[in-house]
C-alpha cells in the first residue's frame, strides 16, 4: 500500500482495503473470511447457482473464491451483473468496515481517494500497479476503479453517521 496526499493506492492480501485481506465478518447472517468470498457468494446467489455458492463458503483462499465466482456453472448475465455489482460490493464492504478496527482504518484515510492499484483489473481497479508512473494521475488510469469508488462512498457514509456499528 502506498499513501499520498490525495490517494490510498492498495492491492493485495496485506491491505485491509483489499477483498483478499483476511478479516472474518458477518454479512446477511453468514460468516465470511474475506470480502471476496462474500461478493462471490452473493454473485453466485444472484444467478441462482446455489451449488457454487456453497463451494464458495468452503473455499480455502480468496483466489479460490474468485475462480469459483467465475465458474461456467454460474448462468452469468453481464447486464444483470453490471446492474447489481456495485450495490452488492457496497453491501458487503459496508459490513466489513462496520467493525471498530476496520472502521478506524477507513476513517484514518481522511479525504483521500481509494485506488485499487491492480495492474490486471480494469473494472474494479485502476489497471496500473502502485509504482507505475501514472498511478497517481486518475486521468491516466486504465481502469474504472469501481472498488476505490465504493470504498470512498462507504467512508463518507461512516463519516456522516450513516454507516458502521462499532463492533469489535
Feature-to-residue mapping (PLM):
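Charged, low-complexity intrinsically disordered segments
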Residues: 1-168
